[in-house]
Curated annotation (Swiss-Prot):
Main localization, broad class: mitochondrion
Annotated heme c binding sites: C30, C33, H34, M101
PANTHER family in alphabetical order: CYTOCHROME C (PTHR11961)
Protein name per UniProt: Probable cytochrome c 2.2
Compartments (UniProt record): Mitochondrion intermembrane space
GO cellular component labels: mitochondrial intermembrane space
Organism: Caenorhabditis briggsae
Xref: Pfam families: Cytochrom_C (PF00034)
Length: 135
């Protein structure tokens, strides 16, 4: 039983999340486009340091205008909402000048919380400039 944080969008609470389950979700659903342990970008921007960062702000990544202009600061709450339906949260996210974002979201609250827990922990670590994959 983990702590829960407020989920004002649904009136419930965001589950604390499970790091190991989140790591598995990241490998299955996110790692093909994102890294957390490096400053390098892949098809998607690095998620290293994402907590507390404003959307559309990774240097060298070609964001859509919608993502640049959203102005959201990523935290547990905003990630929880975004991960449920990225295209609804930031309309226009799907098109970064050279690829189409295919991630449709995670509908289960527990899966979103697990993924956020993993991202919170690993994205806060000092990045390796040459790391490309999870350990």
């Amino acid at each position: 039983m983990g702590k829960k944080k407020s989920d004002s969008a649904s009136g419930g609470a965001i589950p604390e999340g499970d790091y190991e389950k989140g790591k598995k979700i990241f490998k299955q659903r996110c790692e093909q486009c994102h890294v957390v342990n490096s400053l390098q970008t892949k098809t998607g921007p690095t998620l290293n340091g994402v907590i507390g960062r404003q959307s559309g702000q990774v240097a060298g990544f070609d964001y859509s205008a919608a993502n640049k202009n959203k102005g959201v600061v990523w935290d547990r709450q905003t990630l929880f909402e975004y991960l449920a339906d990225p295209k609804k949260y930031i309309p226009g996210t799907k098109s970064y000048s050279f690829f189409q974002m295919v991630f449709a979201g995670l509908k289960k609250a527990d899966e979103r919380a697990d993924l956020i827990k993993f991202i919170e922990v690993d994205a806060a670590k000092k990045p390796s400039a040459y790391a490309h994959h999870l350990p």
